[in-house]
Amino acid sequence: MTFGRGGAASVVLNVGGARYSLSRELLKDFPLRRVSRLHGCRSERDVLEVCDDYDRERNEYFFDRHSEAFGFILLYVRGHGKLRFAPRMCELSFYNEMIYWGLEGAHLEYCCQRRLDDRMSDTHTFHAAEELGREQPRPTGPEAAPSRRWLERMRRTFEEPTSSLAAQILASVSVVFVIVSMVVLCASTLPDWRAAAADNRSLDDRSRYSASPGREPSGIIEAICIGWFTAECIVRFIVSKNKCEFVKRPLNIIDLLAITPYYISVLMTVFTGENSQLQRAGVTLRVLRMMRIFWVIKLARHFIGLQTLGLTLKRCYREMVMLLVFICVAMAIFSALSQLLEHGLDLETSNKDFASIPAACWWVIISMTTVGYGDMYPITVPGRILGGVCVVSGIVLLALPITFIYHSFVQCYHELKFRSARYSRSLSAEFLN
């Protein structure tokens, strides 16, 4: 190190007001990369790229960082303990101090690594919300500001049900349409409903009616609901900030998949009329139109509970996959053993319900989930003992991830509540004047 006072045997590090004296020999191989970089500095400019300020007279290097965090880090690199978070300090702030001085998250103790992972997972949702809700550059011009504010009002009205009174009314109307559509869809499958509809049509029109919407009161209600959802989707697309992001959202994809079959059936009715092509397509169209049941997922846009469930499943997908693997392994073992004990050992008095391993898999799933339909059950003593072990194993396996999923659900709920309150405050501040 050629910069600084050549005769000084030590240097002074001033970190947030706390002064530490180090010998020059220690700088070259010092465990903290930022401190060791001082050894190679040749000019004051090089020094200021490493630290925040430098006092030539005192040979003192000033770092505008957290002094308490540096004290913990310095004790760790000197071998006087294990690296843990400083008390009364945010985990992310301490982690930023570690990155600044040249340490990685792996240097933390395992318990602190878990706390850091949890905190980083907590903030991931807020970073995504801030990225999506970040304001676009304000356009210039005499009419730019009113136009932008009007589009922003419309977007908040359609995207944030709690942002204003108009948004709450619009959300309530949308929920009513979803419920009405679901009720009509379910009622249309009742035998009495279909019989009453058949009495109002001629025998020749029955097959055609199954693929042609709009001929009965249920069809009229369906057309009104489709019209509302179509208009809502179009308006939301027009006022959205990012059109590509709008198309990629799962709820919008569900809207498109639920609306499209209706228009396909209408177009086929118009262009094919009464020929056999429409009759052959009737089954396909009925399957597609049954996708309207997914409209119930639209309620997630208006109810924070469904949003919490979706976010919890997204965060806990690793635990879900792990649980699925456990169940599959247990199902393979118990189904093979039950088939052997109930059918494979004694063919004369064998249990026909366990004639194959795939057939036994159904019994294993029902037993592990403690449902117990009773449609098939073991009759031999070894088979019943195996059934008891299967039930107990299922209870244990299903209970393993419950605690983690519960805490994740509560955490996601509080996050979404906080985000909703933050959006409401930002809306009031933006449109108050």
From Swiss-Prot:
Which segment of this protein is annotated as the motif Selectivity filter? 370-375
Where the protein is mainly located, per its record? Answer: membrane
Secretion signal: which residues? none
What InterPro entries is this protein classified in? BTB/POZ_dom, Ion_trans_dom, K_chnl_volt-dep_Kv, K_chnl_volt-dep_Kv5/Kv9, SKP1/BTB/POZ_sf, T1-type_BTB, VG_K_chnl, Volt_channel_dom_sf
Sorted alphabetically, which Pfam families does this protein's record hold? BTB_2, Ion_trans
Tissue specificity, in the record's words, reads: Expressed strongly in neuronal cells and weakly in glial cells.
**Record-level GO cellular component terms:** endoplasmic reticulum; membrane; plasma membrane; voltage-gated potassium channel complex
Query: Could you tell me the membrane topology recorded for this protein?
Result: Multi-pass membrane protein
Chain ranges passing through the membrane: 166-187, 218-239, 251-271, 282-302, 318-339, 385-413
GO BP, sorted A to Z:
action potential; potassium ion transmembrane transport; protein homooligomerization; regulation of potassium ion transmembrane transport; regulation of potassium ion transport
GO molecular function, a single term: voltage-gated potassium channel activity
Ranges within the bilayer without spanning: 358-369, 370-377
Gene3D superfamilies membership: 1.10.287.70, Potassium Channel Kv1.1, Chain A (3.30.710.10), Voltage-gated potassium channels. Chain C (1.20.120.350)
Q: What residue ranges lie in the Extracellular compartment? A: 188-217, 272-281, 340-357, 378-384
* Subcellular location per the Swiss-Prot or TrEMBL entry: Cell membrane; Cytoplasm
Q: What UniProt keywords are attached to this protein's entry? A: Cell membrane, Cytoplasm, Ion channel, Ion transport, Membrane, Potassium, Potassium channel, Potassium transport, Transmembrane, Transmembrane helix, Transport, Voltage-gated channel
Q: Which residues lie on this side of the membrane: Cytoplasmic?
A: 1-165, 240-250, 303-317, 414-433
Query: According to its record, what is known about the domains?
Result: The transmembrane segment S4 functions as a voltage-sensor and is characterized by a series of positively charged amino acids at every third position. Channel opening and closing is effected by a conformation change that affects the position and orientation of the voltage-sensor paddle formed by S3 and S4 within the membrane. A transmembrane electric field that is positive inside would push the positively charged S4 segment outwards, thereby opening the pore, while a field that is negative inside would pull the S4 segment inwards and close the pore.
Complex and partners: Heterotetramer with KCNB1. Does not form homomultimers.
Its family?
A: Belongs to the potassium channel family. G (TC 1.A.1.2) subfamily. Kv6.3/KCNG3 sub-subfamily.
Any idea what job this protein has? Regulatory subunit of the voltage-gated potassium (Kv) channel which, when coassembled with KCNB1, modulates the kinetics parameters of the heterotetrameric channel namely the inactivation and deactivation rate. Potassium channel subunit that does not form functional channels by itself. Reduces the deactivation rate. Moderately acceleratee activation.
- The protein's name: Voltage-gated potassium channel regulatory subunit KCNG3
Q: Which organism is it from?
A: Rattus norvegicus (Rat)
Upper taxonomic classification of the species?
Eukaryota, Metazoa, Chordata, Craniata, Vertebrata
